[in-house]
Each structure stands twice: as C-alpha cells, then as structure tokens.
Amino acid sequence: MRKIIVGSRRSKLALTQTNWFINELKAAGAPFEFEVKEIVTKGDQILDVQLSKVGGKGLFVKEIEQALYEKEIDFAVHSMKDMPAVLPEGLVIGCIPPREDARDAFISKGHVKFSELPAGAVVGTSSLRRSAQLLTVRPDLEIKWIRGNVDTRLAKLETEEYDAIILAAAGLKRLGWSEDVVTEFLSVEDCLPAVAQGSLGIECREDDTELLDELAKLTDQLTWQEAHAERAFLAAMDGGCQVPIAGYATSNGEEITLTGLVAAPDASVVYKETVVGSDAQKIGEELATILTKQGAFDLIQRVKAEQDAK
C-alpha cells in the first residue's frame, strides 16, 4: 500500500484541518497509508509585523509548495484564502471539499454588538480587508493589528487593550469552539469575506494521477465553482495581502452570483459590484473588468507601489 506524506503547517487549526481531510479520504476508501509532515512557513515565523508589509499571498504556502516539488510530501491541505490566485507550474488544486461558514466572526468583551461599540473602541484584526470594511461602517473605531493563532488572539482579547477582535468563523468552527464565544457573525453584506474563505484547497503535483483520482472523489462541485469564480476575480485584479480585496460567490449548480470588493486601506475609496452568470472563470474576469473600469486596478497598483516604497 502506498504511503502518502501530507504536508501541514504546525498550527492547531492547520493540523486539525489536515487530519480531518485524511479521515475523509480513509472513509472514502482511499487505498493509502498516511503520514503528516509538519512544515514551518515564513508567515508562521513573522509574528511581529503586519502580513501586508512582508509580502503578498503565499506567505503560508511557499515552503509547503517547495516540499511538493522536491517530493518530500504528496499533498497539502491549505486554508484556501492563503493560496495565491495563480499556482506554480506543475502544481494543481486536486480537491476542494464542502465549504465551511465563510463569514467573519465578531467577538467582543461583554458581548457588546458591533453596532453598539462606543466611539474610539479598539478592534483587533490582521486583515486589511476586514479593517477597511469595518471603517466604512464605523469610521469612529480604532483598528489595531493583531497576530497569532486563534487561541492566542482570543487570549489577547482578554489581556490586552482590545474591545473586540474579528476572526474567520470557519476556523472557530473547525477547532470546535462553541458559538457562545461569538458575539455575532457579520453578514457578507457588511463584511464581504476573503476570496475562498471557509474553503480548503488540497494541493498536489499535477502528474500524480493515482492521487488525483482519489482526491477528486471528495470535491464538492458547488464549492469548486464558487472558489473558481472568486479566484478568477482575484487573479484578474492582481490582488494579494497588500490591498483590501474581497470576493464571495454562491452557486446553485446552474447560476453563480459573485460579489467583489476593492478598497483603499483607509476606506476612503471602496469599489463593490455583483455579477451573475454560469461560467465561473468568465464571471470572475467580468467582475474584474467592471471594477477596473471604475478605478480599482489602478488603486491596487498604487497601494502596492506605496507599500514597496516603505
């Protein structure tokens, strides 16, 4: 029986997601043995700087992709929102299982709702996407960046000068946190999720047909369509961690509705549109074209240039 080496980051969430997917493969009868190899990524090592200041997408995947190239591992389970829109040559997404909750979770001291936070309240997030959208609704809030895994951030809420923090609902749910810890889930209308938020992407070598055949059995077609549309939009916009960019699609199997957002980091400018269609790639590109005509692409390039100059 072939032994499959699975690459994973060392965080509790990453290992939980990896082991969950391995168990799904076993339940589906995949004819493999499995071993997990833990890999430290650049994003795991840099904890004292905002991610937007140390590079774009890929901070949590490059070392893992290198291990795939060198055949140290056979596949990796990623939080898909961490994956660059364009994969390196020779690597593919072999499976996207059903999506978990794509929303953002708002967690505050004393369970004070977002709309009831006092002026000047401090909200912790490491995401430019979240901060820009929060400031659009509540420009009177103070955004303070926060890094670390889920447990670390929840601890910081209790011990440091934060009135609230924002986390991905999917991570909380996968780790088994009770919904009691969440003050409220932010609607996608108020806080559009990151591209592919809540989805897992299983990355492997494109020539590993034996493995790809088994991975394909666990793909959820609706989630695949949604992720494809969102990632096509991200790729066309040349977006990354340096710019607030969001994309969220829903598919009923025939029709895909895709909403995209690009904003200035200080929320002074926000571009947001929705398109509907049946072809995931086409509507992702169509949405990018619409926002580009409005000025979103120029904004992205300008913000990137400013970041690179610092």
From Swiss-Prot:
EC number(s) reported in the record: 2.5.1.61
Q: Which cofactor(s) does the record list? A: dipyrromethane
Task: Read off the Gene3D superfamilies from this record.
Answer: Periplasmic binding protein-like II (3.40.190.10), Porphobilinogen deaminase, C-terminal domain (3.30.160.40)
Which BP terms does GO give this entry?
protoporphyrinogen IX biosynthetic process
Keyword list, A-Z: Porphyrin biosynthesis, Transferase
Cofactor binding description: Binds 1 dipyrromethane group covalently.
Q: Which NCBIfam families does its entry note? A: hemC
Q: Which family does it belong to?
A: Belongs to the HMBS family.
- Summarize the protein's role: Tetrapolymerization of the monopyrrole PBG into the hydroxymethylbilane pre-uroporphyrinogen in several discrete steps.
Q: What is this protein called?
A: Porphobilinogen deaminase
- Give the originating organism: Lysinibacillus sphaericus (strain C3-41)
Q: What is the lineage of its organism?
A: Bacteria, Bacillati, Bacillota, Bacilli, Bacillales
Q: Which gene encodes it?
A: hemC
